[in-house]
Protein backbone atom coordinates (compact mmCIF):
# COMPACT_ATOMS: atom_id res chain seq x y z
CA UNK A 1 0.00 0.00 0.00
CA UNK A 2 1.42 3.34 -1.05
CA UNK A 3 1.04 6.18 1.45
CA UNK A 4 -0.45 9.42 0.19
CA UNK A 5 1.51 12.63 0.50
CA UNK A 6 -0.26 15.26 2.53
CA UNK A 7 -0.39 18.61 0.78
CA UNK A 8 -1.17 21.93 2.44
CA UNK A 9 -1.28 25.48 1.15
CA UNK A 10 1.36 27.93 2.32
CA UNK A 11 -0.43 30.32 4.72
CA UNK A 12 1.41 33.30 3.21
CA UNK A 13 1.29 32.82 -0.56
CA UNK A 14 -1.03 29.84 -1.05
CA UNK A 15 1.49 27.68 -2.93
CA UNK A 16 1.04 23.91 -2.46
CA UNK A 17 3.52 22.43 0.05
CA UNK A 18 4.13 18.71 0.50
CA UNK A 19 4.10 17.90 4.22
CA UNK A 20 7.33 15.99 4.68
CA UNK A 21 11.08 16.10 5.18
CA UNK A 22 11.54 17.65 1.73
CA UNK A 23 9.73 20.78 2.97
CA UNK A 24 11.80 22.09 5.90
CA UNK A 25 9.75 25.29 6.30
CA UNK A 26 6.34 23.58 6.41
CA UNK A 27 3.62 24.74 6.50
CA UNK A 28 5.37 27.54 4.59
CA UNK A 29 6.81 26.99 1.11
CA UNK A 30 10.07 28.83 1.84
CA UNK A 31 12.03 30.81 4.41
CA UNK A 32 10.76 34.09 2.91
CA UNK A 33 7.10 33.21 3.54
CA UNK A 34 7.99 32.01 7.04
CA UNK A 35 9.67 35.35 7.82
CA UNK A 36 6.78 37.35 6.36
CA UNK A 37 4.43 35.52 8.74
CA UNK A 38 6.77 36.09 11.69
CA UNK A 39 6.90 39.80 10.86
CA UNK A 40 3.10 40.01 10.81
CA UNK A 41 2.96 38.50 14.31
CA UNK A 42 5.75 40.80 15.53
CA UNK A 43 3.95 43.87 14.15
CA UNK A 44 0.75 42.61 15.84
CA UNK A 45 -1.06 42.41 12.49
CA UNK A 46 -2.01 38.90 13.62
CA UNK A 47 -2.98 37.96 17.14
CA UNK A 48 -4.88 35.34 19.08
CA UNK A 49 -8.29 36.72 20.12
CA UNK A 50 -8.84 37.24 23.84
CA UNK A 51 -11.77 38.35 25.97
CA UNK A 52 -9.52 40.49 28.16
CA UNK A 53 -7.12 43.22 27.21
CA UNK A 54 -3.89 43.11 29.20
CA UNK A 55 -1.24 45.75 29.17
CA UNK A 56 2.36 45.17 30.18
CA UNK A 57 1.78 47.02 33.45
CA UNK A 58 -0.99 44.58 34.42
CA UNK A 59 1.41 41.63 34.38
CA UNK A 60 4.62 43.05 35.83
CA UNK A 61 5.29 45.05 38.93
CA UNK A 62 8.36 47.26 39.09
CA UNK A 63 8.29 47.08 42.90
CA UNK A 64 9.18 43.38 43.07
CA UNK A 65 10.73 42.10 39.83
CA UNK A 66 11.44 38.65 41.32
CA UNK A 67 7.82 38.11 42.33
CA UNK A 68 6.92 36.83 38.86
Swiss-Prot record:
<feature type="binding site">
    <location>
        <position position="13"/>
    </location>
    <ligand>
        <name>Zn(2+)</name>
    </ligand>
</feature>
<feature type="compositionally biased region" description="Acidic residues">
    <location>
        <begin position="53"/>
        <end position="68"/>
    </location>
</feature>
<dbReference type="GO" id="GO:0008657">
    <property type="term" value="F:DNA topoisomerase type II (double strand cut, ATP-hydrolyzing) inhibitor activity"/>
</dbReference>
<comment type="similarity">
    <text>Belongs to the DNA gyrase inhibitor YacG family.</text>
</comment>
<feature type="binding site">
    <location>
        <position position="10"/>
    </location>
    <ligand>
        <name>Zn(2+)</name>
    </ligand>
</feature>
<dbReference type="Pfam" id="PF03884">
    <property type="entry name" value="YacG"/>
</dbReference>
<protein>
    <recommendedName>
        <fullName>DNA gyrase inhibitor YacG</fullName>
    </recommendedName>
</protein>
<dbReference type="GO" id="GO:0006355">
    <property type="term" value="P:regulation of DNA-templated transcription"/>
</dbReference>
<feature type="binding site">
    <location>
        <position position="33"/>
    </location>
    <ligand>
        <name>Zn(2+)</name>
    </ligand>
</feature>
<dbReference type="InterPro" id="IPR005584">
    <property type="entry name" value="DNA_gyrase_inhibitor_YacG"/>
</dbReference>
<keyword id="KW-0479">Metal-binding</keyword>
<feature type="region of interest" description="Disordered">
    <location>
        <begin position="45"/>
        <end position="68"/>
    </location>
</feature>
<comment type="function">
    <text>Inhibits all the catalytic activities of DNA gyrase by preventing its interaction with DNA. Acts by binding directly to the C-terminal domain of GyrB, which probably disrupts DNA binding by the gyrase.</text>
</comment>
<keyword id="KW-0862">Zinc</keyword>
<comment type="subunit">
    <text>Interacts with GyrB.</text>
</comment>
<dbReference type="InterPro" id="IPR013088">
    <property type="entry name" value="Znf_NHR/GATA"/>
</dbReference>
<dbReference type="GO" id="GO:0008270">
    <property type="term" value="F:zinc ion binding"/>
</dbReference>
<feature type="binding site">
    <location>
        <position position="29"/>
    </location>
    <ligand>
        <name>Zn(2+)</name>
    </ligand>
</feature>
Amino acid sequence: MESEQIQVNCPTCGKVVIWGEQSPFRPFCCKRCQLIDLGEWADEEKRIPSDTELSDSDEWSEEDPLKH
